[in-house]
């Protein structure tokens, strides 16, 4: 028996009740170097993104992804199925340009499930291939959520940035009855987003063959992106004050990053580089979150590093 699928309108303009995205609270680690580049300011207005109640034991259903203001030509689709309380998502996208076209800080795309209450869950990194296509199979225990894709400084962020690239869109054949209700919350903060036009232009010229840069293999490219994400994560953690509030965790992240750097120098295509870099990224994000929580909830033993 088919469960009813309800649509809850998620208005895209209020802060989520989670730790802020690193880009929302700290300056870009490379901002000084990029300050001379022309910036294009984009005002993102409120809009509605549907959240679907997939329920329990529903039949597989399909949803589409539509490109948002930053990349309107991007598109995708997903098959969503609930099994024993776990919702499985098999998604694919096309016309998904590299996140680096938005600036040096954007190194990853992340798929998010966002509940009507505003809680966001990172469902995994999306890695476009040379043909601007990507796939991701993932799952969540959330039952009612919207799906969005954002550009991020690294894969392990715990709060979406404002750079929403894609958002889910209902299809005519979506399983179940659709009901739209008024939401009393908003999904993402309204804000002004700076696009680095020089980065966009350089990226697009490189894809069109107008820019002559060093070409590397796919494996080496993955190693480099992993290292850059880890460096970003460490810098954001340091800027948040992790050296004082989460010194041990931050040092662990730095040690992992150093091992990844040395492994890359010895063997750029080694899978170990990506493994170490991703562990460094996650550990650095842990240090940043520990720092934010300790700063917001002072305690007598707060000065002691984790």
Language-model features, listed with the residues they occupy:
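Bacterial N-terminal signal peptides
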Residues: 4-15
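Transition segment at domain starts
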Residues: 37-85, 175-190
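Exposed aromatic-hydrophobic patches
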Residues: 90-93, 98, 124, 130-140
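Short coil-to-beta strand junction motifs in C2/discoidin
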Residues: 102-109
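Short acidic/polar inter-strand loop motif in beta-rich domains
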Residues: 151-160
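Amphipathic, heptad-repeat alpha-helical segments
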Residues: 195-257, 299-306
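Amphipathic, non-membrane alpha-helical rod segments
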Residues: 239-279, 283
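Long, amphipathic alpha-helical segments that form or neighbor coiled-coils/leucine zippers used
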Residues: 269-306
